[in-house]
UniProtKB/Swiss-Prot annotation:
Tissue: Component of the acid-insoluble organic matrix of calcified shell layers (at protein level).
Lipid metabolism as UniProt keyword: no
Stretch forming the signal peptide: 1-20
Protein species of origin: Haliotis asinina
Domain of life: Eukaryota
Protein name as annotated: Uncharacterized protein 5
Entries under InterPro entries matching the protein: Methyltransf_FA
Amino acid sequence: MWYKVLGIVSLCSVYVSTQGSNLQCKIAGGGELIPIRTPEYRAWVPLGEVGLNVSDSKVLIFAARSCFGAHILLQNNAEDFKNAVYEIVIGGMKNTRSGIRQCVGCKFDEWVKDKALNCRFFNYFWISWCGDEVWVGHGYRPPHNRILRYKYENQPVINAASVRSESDTYWAL
């Protein structure tokens, strides 16, 4: 069953620094639920091709049902999967850790041990790229339940996002 709770709201406040400053960060999507399935180890699925534009947004809220390895790629250019990207891995390494890195497949810049994914049920997540930090959290209420935070020097503008997976994954975006 797909839950309409993932309908995207227009704006949210996201805390983006340790000083507690606020930015109004637009959330990707227009309220329509987009279901996607990514078979294991296939090519990236650009979200723009399925109707989700992130170019004027700073937050992505989604749900994933997977045994392990849900990958989200934040990109400067929708056609470039290698340069000026951030790869967020949720439930990687057989669902033992999640992390953020500046290139596909390289060493994590920041990671945590967790069992974020579930083979039978959807779990909700959010990703924020407000300011010069990338945040990742559980649930659908950023900035609550943050699990990852990483500050990048000279962060490129995020204009696109793509998804893929290490195991058969169902997404609700």
